[in-house]
Each structure stands twice: as C-alpha cells, then as structure tokens.
Amino acid sequence: MLIIKQKVVRLINLSILTTFLICGCNNSNNQVSENKITTPSLQSNSTANCRKIKHDFGLTKICSQPQKVVVLSPHTLDLLLSLDLQPAGYAAPINLYREEKYNNPAQQIPYLGTQVTTKPINLGTGSKPSLERLTALKPDLIIGDAGSRNYYSVLSKIAPTLLWNNRTKAGKWQENIQKIAKALGREQQAQQAIDNYEKQIAATRVELAPVIATHPKLLVLGTDNLQKNISIVNPNSYLGEILQGIGFKLVSLPSLKNDSKPLIPISIETLPKLNQADTIIVMGYNLNFGKELQSGANKQFNRDIENNQSQPAKNAWKKNAIAQSLSASKENRVYFATYYRWNGLNGPIGTELVIEQLREFLLSKDTNNDTP
C-alpha cells in the first residue's frame, strides 16, 4: 500500500513539474532589468585570477576555479553536463524524488539522469531551493535560470550566482554555455558543444532530406487536451532553430510574424488556418496524474514519462473533429512527443534527444503514431 501511494505522489509531482517547465518558458519573456545585482565572489579576496561574468540578472565576479557547482534547473544541468562537468547539487522544477541525495540519478532525473555520475544533493526545486542544504553544501558556484530569480540576492550570499533568462529563445543556449564556460574555465568544451551541435544539424539535414523534400512544412504544437491550453512554436525559438536548420519550413500564422515569443497561445478553432502543414508534432503535457510510473531500467522510466505526459493530448486529438479534419491527421502524419523532452531541456543534450525522436518518427518503418 505504501509503495502504491509513493508512486501516485511521484506521478502528481511529475505533472506539476511539467507545469513549472511551461510556466518557466512563459515567464522567460518578462523584463528583468530591475532585478540586476552586482555580486562579488565569496571564494577569494585575490583579484589575480578573477573574471566578471555578465548574466541575465546581473554581473558576478568569480575568482579562482570553482570546483563544487550546483545547478537549479534541467536547462542548466544540460549545459553543465555538456561541458563535461558533474553537479554537486541539483534542484528540479519540482521534486520527483524527496531524499537528501539523488542516489540513482538515472531513475530520479528524467532524460539527463543517465549522464549524471555523481550523487548530487537534492536541493528541492528551482523556484524554492533549499537554502539550508545549499549553505551546508558550500558550493563554489550556483547556476540557475529565471525560475530562481526571486532568490537571487539570497543565493548570491551563499556563493557566486549566475541566472539565465529566455531559455527557449533561438541561440540562447549557445550564449549561456559560453558564459558558464568562462566562469568554469571550460571555453574549449563550450565551443566543442556548439560545433558538435552544428555538425549534428548538418548531418540530420542530409539524412532527412528525402523526407523533407516530400513533406517540407512542419507544425509544432504544445497542449494538454486541446481545450484550454494549446500553443504554436514560433520559428524564432530553440525548436525553430533546430527544425529550420534541419531543413523544415515551420508553419505559423501570418499574424504572428512579428511576435517574438517562442511559444504563442492559440485556440483550437485556429488549426484549420494551419492546414498547410504536411507533418504535425504535438508536445503533450499532463497536468493530472494518470497511469503510475513504473520502476526499472531508465529506458522504461523515460518511456513511462512519455506515455503519461503525451496521453491526454493524444486522446484529445483522436476525438477532436477539427484536429481530425487536418490533412496531416488524414495522412497519419501526426506524432506525439513530450514538452519536457522537446522544450524543457533546451541545450546540446536536449537537442540530441529531439533529433533522436525525430528520426524515430520520420525514418522508422515501424513507427506507430499512437506511441510517443
């Protein structure tokens, strides 16, 4: 009975986690200049080996070489791992795991956990990090994003702090990783991550060229059940940059041409105006708990997350007359993914995961559009 309750709680937490990811995306468009603070490094009085790092919430002086680094979001975890570094502590959008340490990250941190080789201290959530655990950990550097902005001044008293905004904007992760790399003395690794990204985009463009030649127009949506929340991915976004780089023409509305927001809310009645799309990818998220997550291998862990998070959108799409009237639906070219995987990581590793699934959708003869 206790195990069942723990699984249900875990599922509820996952649903709320997705909400935080989406809200974090929407909040990233807010102006934050009024929150800027200049923070001195607490680690060294010497200025001989200091550098000033400009980030989206201020200017931070960092001296010496940070050894113990904590990250407060999936995005910054992606960037840290891409620099071939490991976290001493991690704060998720919301706790899926409530013990003091992530003892088995592959089963406790979605998508990125397989690459975490440490046992990071569980710092709670990015929007409300555990100041007690942070203080006890004594990090040399704290890295987070807009979700932690309300704690910026407090975090800066614990350790030099870098916070980033607009993670879903085109080109943003490349900017962020270079500045983080400067703070950590990993400039070469940052450039390598960017170079590898560009090579991967170019290789995928060649690999998918026959598919894109036949079906060039792609529509990407985010939704839970099509009724209250549905958004269209703007070409000027992290995903737009990937998909257009591969060769797709991203479908949008003419009225949204000058809208700079990466994700733009629309209504279900708007979908017929987007019917020129040859292919549709629906990023689903589930705000209500459904089937329980299963324990086991990480592959199964991530598969259960995908099934749970995409199922409401998938079911709603099948039952909705407007959605079914679209050409892509009639031709069985609608694919279901998760918002978490496609637009919650926003970094080099996240890009690899997007491209990996895109290949599965478009190249696998055995792909069943009913399975994420």
Functional labels for PLM-detected ranges:
Residues 2-12:
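Bacterial N-terminal signal peptides that target proteins for export
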Residues 151-154, 159-228, 333, 340-372:
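Extracytoplasmic substrate-binding proteins
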Residues 77-130:
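A short, structured surface patch at a secondary-structure boundary
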Residues 21-24:
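C-terminal motif of bacterial Sec signal peptides marking the signal peptidase cleavage site
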Residues 70-71, 76-80, 192-253, 261:
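Basic- and aromatic-lined ligand-binding clefts that recognize polyanionic substrates
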Residues 284-372:
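Structured C-terminal subdomain patch of bacterial secreted/periplasmic proteins
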Residues 26-29:
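Bacterial signal peptide processing site
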Residues 131-143, 160, 271, 276-281:
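Proline-aspartate-enriched helix->loop->beta-strand connector
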